[in-house]
Amino acid sequence: MKDSVIRKLEGLLERNEEVLALLSDAGIIADQERFRALSKEYSQLEDVVKAFKSFQQAEEDLESAKEMMEEDDAELKEMAQEEYKAAKETIETLESELQILLLPKDPNDDNNCFIEIRAGAGGDEAAIFAGDLFRMYSKYAESNRWQIEVMNTNEGEHGGFKEVIAKISGEGVYGKLKFESGGHRVQRVPETESQGRVHTSACTVIVLPEIPEAEAIEINKADLKVDTFRASGAGGQHVNKTDSAIRITHIPTGIVVECQDQRSQHKNRAQAMSVLSARIQAVEDEKRRSEEDSTRRNLVSSGDRSERIRTYNFPQGRVSEHRINLTLYRLGEFMEGDIDVVIEPLIQETQADMLAALGEG
């Protein structure tokens, strides 16, 4: 491993010890905000420090094995050769692991997120598929012990949703789900299709990180148009008799957010403002990214909403992830929330892309 990388890792190890000492300081414990920030930093350093300590131990084991190999005893020599080989393999594995752990982190990866699913081309079938996608993400959230909270729904006439917005809360939510942004296409025979013909329809998924209040962009109240209206209850849902639903328009950007799934206007307004803040931040981030990436495009996109990223083919039981040319014949399990089979390769591809870019640099 390069000396510059070793020096960086030694600096992180030192910082980890500093943070640990600070966390037991009475003054820090009394200052909740500072304590929270240091706890978060300690947690972020944990994996890289653990891997580096294992790396240092493996290097010591390698040196010990080298010395033992100089012994005259044949049995001891053979044992030393085995230890040398094992230590060398451990070092190689940990070098790769540490390279990935040192890659620049997306500061939003640990945040909660908002997921917006909208039916596109395909009418009723697109709305039904939007409902299927929402169920898939709900199952995935459940398997990760994340909390999911519906914020707004616009139901389809024959089931599913024309639009659904939900907040997903938990550890590392945005880092996992951000790659779901884009166009999702479905090919299947609708239940109403008597000829058995396969129809194609589409949905758009947008995943935005929740922006903590302290980091949120300041929104000028004069830039907002706020409308209240009566929530449209469906089927077995309650129908509000008061104007508790909220529609907020951010005039400078034209972004419109509606929230009506809470019974109180106050709660709907608070939720609408947090979604609005996330959307405005996303517009700003996109602007900055396009300036930074004008010379280079990432292999894996995590934000191009117009790009078709995945096809779900029901007659063939196939899911195709177009960004990394991955095809899997396990659509049933996938729709039940087993989506790590695609998310993990997408994360790995992104890491490989970043490592290649660092190599070029």
Swiss-Prot record:
SUPFAM superfamilies named among the record's database cross-references: Release factor
N5-methylglutamine: residues carrying this PTM: 237
Entry annotated with the keyword Cytoplasm: yes
InterPro entries in the record: PCRF (IPR005139), Pep_chain_release_fac_I (IPR000352), Pep_chain_release_fac_I_sf (IPR045853), Prokaryotic/Mito_RF (IPR050057), RF-1 (IPR004373)
Entry keyword set: Cytoplasm, Methylation, Protein biosynthesis
Biased composition range(s): Basic and acidic residues: 284-296
Processing and modification events after translation: Methylated by PrmC. Methylation increases the termination efficiency of RF1.
Region ranges (Disordered): 284-305
Alphabetical list of Gene3D superfamilies matching this protein: 3.30.160.20, 3.30.70.1660, 6.10.140.1950
Domain of life: Bacteria
A single MF term (Gene Ontology): translation release factor activity, codon specific
Paired cysteines (S-S): none
Family to which the UniProt record says this protein belongs: Belongs to the prokaryotic/mitochondrial release factor family.
NCBIfam families per record: prfA (TIGR00019), PRK00591.1 (NF001859)
Function: Peptide chain release factor 1 directs the termination of translation in response to the peptide chain termination codons UAG and UAA.
Protein name per its UniProtKB record: Peptide chain release factor 1
Gene: prfA
